[in-house]
């Protein structure tokens, strides 16, 4: 419930004729380490960083008026994007006809998010039914929430969390198994085509 400035940085990849947008904030992302400090202690505000990132990405897409065909979320830092898109932003015309794909990686965070994480989501407008899924705000439950709100899933690492592997066997959604580096580009393109057809 605090205001933090959203900084959008733009870079170009000339050879691909592509622009890349970076979501930034001095308080959340100007650190020497990404998830944990040099002693391996996970940052206490990783929950707020994930919330800020999700809202920042979605608000940037809205501001630039990009109507996506596919929103591909990679890893737990983006896990709230599917939730927000399918709940808070579900009536926004920019997000009218698109698919969400969530890639799951072997990048578990080990500690739980802070105990008031559900309150932060409630403040953002996430309903009580969804908050039940994250009563224990850990990597597995936050990933399950992302899986629930995604249309398709990609296994991005050779091995992933064992509990998520079991959970995926119960999910009735298209799942692309892990692809070797030499094959993943074609496999992803085919998966995107399948999701859009």
Regions found by a protein language model. Give the residues of each.
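Catalytic cores of nucleotide-sugar-dependent glycosyltransferases that transfer UDP/GDP/TDP-activated
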Residues: 1-197
């Amino acid at each position: 419930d605090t205001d933090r400035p959203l900084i959008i940085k733009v870079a170009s990849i000339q050879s691909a004729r592509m622009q890349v947008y970076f979501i930034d904030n001095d308080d959340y992302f100007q650190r020497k380490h990404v998830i944990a400090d040099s002693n391996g202690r996970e940052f206490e505000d990783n929950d707020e960083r994930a919330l800020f990132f999700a809202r920042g990405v979605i608000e940037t897409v809205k501001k630039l008026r990009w109507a996506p065909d596919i929103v591909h979320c990679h890893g737990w830092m983006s896990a709230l994007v599917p939730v927000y898109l399918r709940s808070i932003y579900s009536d926004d015309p920019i997000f009218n006809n698109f698919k969400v794909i969530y890639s799951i990686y072997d990048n578990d965070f080990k500690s739980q998010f802070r105990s008031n994480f559900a309150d932060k989501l409630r403040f953002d407008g996430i309903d009580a039914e969804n908050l039940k899924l994250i009563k224990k705000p850990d990597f597995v439950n936050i990933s399950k929430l992302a899986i629930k709100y995604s249309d398709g899933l990609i296994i991005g690492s050779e091995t992933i969390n064992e509990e998520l592997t079991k959970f995926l066997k119960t999910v009735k959604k298209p799942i692309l198994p892990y692809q070797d580096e030499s094959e993943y580009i074609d496999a992803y393109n085919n998966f995107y085509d399948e999701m859009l057809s």
